[in-house]
Swiss-Prot record:
Region described as Disordered: spans on this chain: 68-126
Domain F-box: 1-46
Sequence ranges of Low complexity compositional bias: 85-100
Organism: Arabidopsis thaliana
Protein name as it appears in the record: Putative F-box protein At4g22420
Amino acid composition bias (Acidic residues), ranges on this chain: 101-114
């Protein structure tokens, strides 16, 4: 019987839980020393990649977790708060009692501007909810292309039928509900 390299054996032992390994009866003393050394286990565990998400979402790069309107509202709120802080410190009526308040506000705005110049709209990170992969963290629905591919009715035909209205539109709506029930 050929012997395995000790490095390979040590690596296998390091990947198992210490409690599991201590239950084993046939282990040499060097293996127990590896099990009991916490720094060795921490080094090995930190090198391993994070676990996969468990689902494959092709539209994830297209999703946007933040709205531009929300950012604009946030900037307006900061500016109004800065104005209120300035009035509270005695900057009202054109008299500046303390010049530090205005400088602090200017510094904060400069920092925000520098940070926003470095990031583009496309570099925003979208967090995916693990409990429901079809929703992002803002609870917006991420459209799944596969559902539309399964319909077998070209989108142009569907649009045409919906525009004509009447029985055709109702029939199309009924058909879509039936197909979506089967797929979901």
């Amino acid at each position: 019987m050929a012997e395995c390299p000790t490095d390979l054996i040590n690596e296998m032992f390091l990947r198992l839980r210490a409690t599991t390994l201590k239950k084993c009866r046939v282990l040499s003393k060097p293996c127990f020393s590896l099990i009991d050394s916490p720094e060795k286990r921490v080094i090995e565990r930190s090198d391993s990649p994070p676990p996969p998400l468990g689902f494959n979402n092709h539209l994830l790069p297209l999703a946007n977790a933040y709205d531009d309107d929300d950012e604009e509202e946030g900037n307006e709120l900061k500016k109004s708060q800065a104005r209120r802080n300035g009035v509270a410190k005695g900057e009202g009526n054109g008299n500046k009692v303390n010049g530090e308040a205005q400088e602090e506000v200017d510094d904060e705005e400069d920092d925000d501007d520098d940070a926003s110049k470095g990031r583009g709209k496309h570099s925003r990170h979208v967090e995916v909810r693990r409990d429901c992969p079809y929703l992002d963290t803002v609870n917006r629905q991420v459209i799944i292309i596969d559902q539309f591919l399964m319909l077998r009715v070209p989108l142009a035909t569907m649009r045409k039928r919906m525009r004509t209205g009447g029985r055709k539109a109702k029939a199309m709506e009924k058909y879509l509900k039936k197909v979506l029930k089967k797929s979901g």
